[in-house]
Regions:
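A short beta-loop-alpha structural element at the N-terminal edge
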Residues: 2-21, 167-190
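Acyl-donor-binding surface of acyltransferase catalytic domains
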Residues: 92-174, 316-321
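Conserved acyl-CoA
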Residues: 102-119, 264, 273-289, 295, ...
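Conserved beta-strand-loop-alpha-helix junction that forms the acyl-donor binding cleft
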Residues: 122-131, 261, 291-302, 320-323
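A short gly/proline-enriched turn/hairpin at secondary-structure junctions
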Residues: 191-199
């Protein structure tokens, strides 16, 4: 068995494509969106990113077994004034147990080394791949967050979570003070808030900053909930325009889709009502299926999504490390 370490560009394109198509990240699994067309699109995105990112491919006897990339995250680097990076586009081939550990350890070591120019780096790994998670932990990465990705049809019968007296409207400028207040008063799991290396107050404002970015750049739609005449919550909705234009599949983006409920409105059904409302909006925009990443410690959210017709798609575990 000969193990080689190469860059993406040094591996034949057909071999890299086969790795992605035969061992895809389980996006939209169990829905009509999980097609070969979607798999090819994800390969195209990874290939495009490989042209500008630091890349790594581990091969065994000339066959690509696992690949990943290191990239800097400009908006986070600018916000925190330090180089913040990510490890992504990770795809791993099913391997016999006797070679799995050695290859994974080789991969995690070399991919971690690519991040040496960053001060803080995160990696998201499919939850079932315990060996890969453990290998990154041996490199000094620690648990940050865990998410269950659930996928739901916009055609699913709803109207079961409509909360009497709740009004949902579009965001206006004056709402930002209330959003800021909600993030201060409502506990929520977030790696930049819980990690001791970041200022928690500034970390919370990062999420307010994201809402303003969506609002000012018109990246999507922000729904505001009012209950008994008071601000109750905010929810972002964004359609992946690049995917829609490239392969004619309309669905939501997989990040930047936060929801925040004000402390005075917690445990009253506001979040489910808002998600129901957003599903209706997605349907009106021609979206058939929506992905929702729920923190896997948030059992009420997961149960509520299940009642809305969302089904389990995949489990992700996020790890991070100060370099």
């Amino acid at each position: 068995m000969v193990i080689d370490i190469k860059k993406w560009d040094d591996v034949p394109n057909d071999k890299m494509k086969e790795l992605f198509l035969e061992n895809p990240y389980p996006l939209y699994r169990g829905t009509p969106l999980g097609t070969d067309l979607m798999k090819e699109y994800m390969f195209t995105l990874a290939k495009k990113s490989a042209s500008i990112n630091d890349t790594l491919v581990v091969l065994v006897d000339g066959v690509p077994m696992i690949t990943g990339q290191f990239y800097l995250i400009p908006y986070l680097s600018k916000y925190w004034n330090i180089p913040i990076g990510g490890l992504g586009h990770i795809v791993i081939r099913n391997m016999p147990a006797d070679i799995n550990t050695k290859i994974i350890d080789t991969f995690s070591l070399h991919l971690s080394n690519l991040a040496s120019n960053a001060k803080f780096v995160s990696v998201t790994i499919p939850g079932p791949n315990i060996a890969l998670i453990r290998s990154f932990e041996q490199r000094g990465f620690a648990y940050a967050e865990g998410f269950i990705n659930m996928v739901g049809s916009t055609n699913y019968f709803r109207d079961q979570f409509r909360l009497k007296g709740l009004v949902i409207r579009d965001l206006v400028e004056n709402d930002f003070d209330e959003i800021d207040s909600a993030y201060k008063k409502t506990p929520f799991p977030a790696r930049f808030v819980s990690d001791g290396g970041f200022d928690p107050e500034k970390a919370r404002k990062l999420y307010v900053h994201r809402c303003r970015e969506v609002y000012e750049q018109r990246l999507g739609k922000i729904f505001i909930a009012e209950l008994e005449g008071k601000f109750a919550g905010a929810l972002i909705g964004i359609i992946d325009k690049e995917m829609a234009e490239t392969i004619n599949i309309k669905t939501n983006t997989l990040s930047g889709m936060g929801i925040i409920i004000h402390s005075r409105a917690l445990r009253r059904g506001v979040s489910m009502h808002m998600i129901e409302h957003r599903q209706d909006w997605y349907k009106s925009e021609g979206v058939d299926y929506v992905n929702f990443g729920a923190n896997f410690n948030n059992r009420p959210m997961i149960l509520g999504l299940d009642k809305l017709g969302f089904k389990y798609g995949s489990l992700d575990v996020a790890l991070h490390k100060w370099i």
